[in-house]
Amino acid sequence: MTQKLAILGGDPVRTRPWPEWPHVGPEDVDRLRTVIESRNLGGIPFPNTMHQQFAERFTAKLGAKYGLLATNGTVTLSMALRALGIHAGDEVITTAFTWVGTVAGIVHVNAVPVLADISDDNWCIDPVKVEEAITDRTRAIMVVHLGNQVADMDALLDICRRHNLLLIEDCAHAHFAEWRGRCVGTIGDAGSYSFETSKIMTSGEGGFLVTATEEAFHRAMSLAHVGRKEAPYDRFPGRVFGWNHRATEMQAAVLLGQLDRYDALDKQRTAMAEMLTQGLVEIGGFKPLAEDPRVTRRQRYELLFRFDTEAWDGLHRDKVLEAILAEGVEFEGNTFYPPMHRDELFHITADDWPAIRERYGEKIEPDAFHLPVAERVAFDEAVWIHHSLLSVEPEDVQDMLDAVVKVRDNLGALKKSL
């Protein structure tokens, strides 16, 4: 394939629009119409009718004991921490390679985030670095199951048992992924899921909390319900000062449809991911991450590849992805997740969050951390392929592969243009 690259003025491989996300059907419109015509749109009574339907079904599909739908995935992380007894000044160790919402969930309860580096194998938090980060103020680990990966839960559970720490799972990317046959989110003390607009299941915004502990669940219900302590969700001591994080009936109505079509879309994504992965391996230059056999079901919110700069004649990832994008195919790099401590959104000051002062002073500065793997992966190696590019047909996957081949076949021209 020697056609002129689109980035140099040629015609792109792909000009047709990609399938739209999210998938919406007439049954979704009917369900929303039912809500609107009922005039019962909000979060009261709590939990409301469709809220309760979705919560029961989603919790059961996960194999969890208790589950709560809330306004978004960041607040369900905060609710999990507070419901489990995390207080101001407690340190929570989390990954350096994540969205800012993970850290916000910690900071918003006035706890202290501690970033640990990632494993080079799966780009999730490195258990060795977690153990090195533990102090006498550490109370919890917040693990993120990233992209299409699952963190090493065996090692993290062992650390938590030996050090008497809580384990909270951020499953924003990992709805129904499994570790040794158990859904992630149900393995630690609590799990949190996101239904933000880009996620595999979406209601525009939304979050979900699961736990196996009745007391923590009831406390979380109170936290979401402005601190009300009402039967039958009142089996916890004392009171909490809550928020209003009640999900609306409209969010729940949309999510019921998302859940109905989940398995069919997952089957399609899996087949297209396998086709795309095989094709990229044959082309060269994009290496899939190793697959841990303990991950018994893998999700594909983002398909992750390691960019091999040598295979691209020394060109940096970002220049290659720019050329592929010009061909009509969006593979993302550093624009998806920079390392957390280098993210412009990572702006945490003691004026706003005084609990950080003892460890960090007046502001958490980027140089408070040494995170070489996260920096290398984020700035040079990580390639992210969004699940919307997997909810497609084989001819669409072929367009992706053709775009990559075209750029590979025209590397010389691309290098000369720099």
UniProtKB/Swiss-Prot annotation:
It catalyses: 3-amino-2,3-dideoxy-scyllo-inosose + L-glutamine = 2-deoxystreptamine + 2-oxoglutaramate. InterPro entries: DegT/StrS_aminotransferase, PyrdxlP-dep_Trfase, PyrdxlP-dep_Trfase_major, PyrdxlP-dep_Trfase_small. Its EC number is 2.6.1.101. Pathway: Metabolic intermediate biosynthesis; 2-deoxystreptamine biosynthesis; 2-deoxystreptamine from D-glucose 6-phosphate: step 4/4; Antibiotic biosynthesis; gentamicin biosynthesis. GO terms for biological process: antibiotic biosynthetic process; polysaccharide biosynthetic process. Transmembrane segments: none annotated. GO terms for molecular function: pyridoxal phosphate binding; transaminase activity. Pfam families: DegT_DnrJ_EryC1 (PF01041). Disulfide bonds: none annotated. CDD domains: AHBA_syn (cd00616). Catalyzes the transamination of 3-amino-2,3-dideoxy-scyllo-inosose (amino-DOI) into 2-deoxystreptamine (DOS). This is Putative L-glutamine:3-amino-2,3-dideoxy-scyllo-inosose aminotransferase.
